[in-house]
Each structure stands twice: as structure tokens, then as C-alpha cells.
Amino acid sequence: NEICQHLGSNGWIYEHPVAQDYDREKAIYTPDLISWVQEAWPDAWESLQSKFGSRAKDQLLSAVRRELDQKGTLEVIRGGVAVFGLRSDLKLAEFKPALGLNEEILKRYKANRLRVARQIKYSLHNENCIDLVLFLNGIPVATVELKTDNTQSIDDAVYQYKKDRQPKPAGQKPEPLLSFPS
């Protein structure tokens, strides 16, 4: 709790006890992604809505998941995603500008949504949880397994990631949160 509260008091979004809006199937915190696009790229969002109506959200989520599967998180955050119906790739984050001269970039940078969520049920196959997930505009960028000094060690956390957090359980579809493109 201390980690989450500290992040929450320093600009991160933290809702206790658990994040209800996490989409296990797509491994995206949907409201943050949609809000980011609506605030940072209102023209792109309006274009998606005019082309797809009530399916605009699904169109965006599917494109993001596809690109995450193909390119990986870092490339998607750095380069954006191709969304059918938009003329150019849609950036999913804005980095702090070296100079604060461009108001539009600064506005998008300030619109970034950083979220910390506890006990994320990530699996499509069971109720396993990851202790902490850090999100940037709805995209998971890091996972953390917490251990106490009294009963567990870092070796326990490493073992848990290696053995209990399989990206592709035997004979099943990959876990989106744990999968990386090959």
C-alpha cells in the first residue's frame, strides 16, 4: 500500500483496493486509453466516431492490442499505432519536450495518465494476480511482485515470474499482459 499511496500522492492515479476497469483479454486499462485519446487527439477520436459510431472504442482497442502483439510495448509507446480509419499513426504517449515552447506537445504531455493498480487478475485461464501493474495511458508498462522481508525473498519473486507467470500456458492462448512479440 505504501508504494501505491506514494505514487498516488505524486501524480499517479491509484484506486484502492483494485482496478475494476482492466480488460484481461486485451491487457489494457480501457478508460485511461480512451480518455488519453479523447484529450490528446480529439480530432482523431472524432474521426473514429464519425466512421465507426459506437464501435469506435472497439476499433481503437483492437488496433492497439494488435500492434502490441506485433511490435511490443516499447515500440507502440514510442511510435504509436496504425488505426484503420485514421490517416496517420496515433501516438499513445507524449514525452516531456526538451523545450516548453510547443503548447500542443506540452498539453499532450500533461494529459498522460500514469496509473498504479494492485492485484490485477491478468489471466484468461485462472484467477492469478500480479501484485502491481504500472500503466501509461492504459498500456501496461511494468509489473511488480511484492515480497515481505519477513517471509519471502527476491528469489521467491524470481521463481514466481519464471514458473507461475507463464506467458503461454501449456495448450492455451498466450496471456496478453505477459506476452512479448517474437
Where are these regions (language model features)?
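An alpha-helical interface "stripe"
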Residues: 1-182
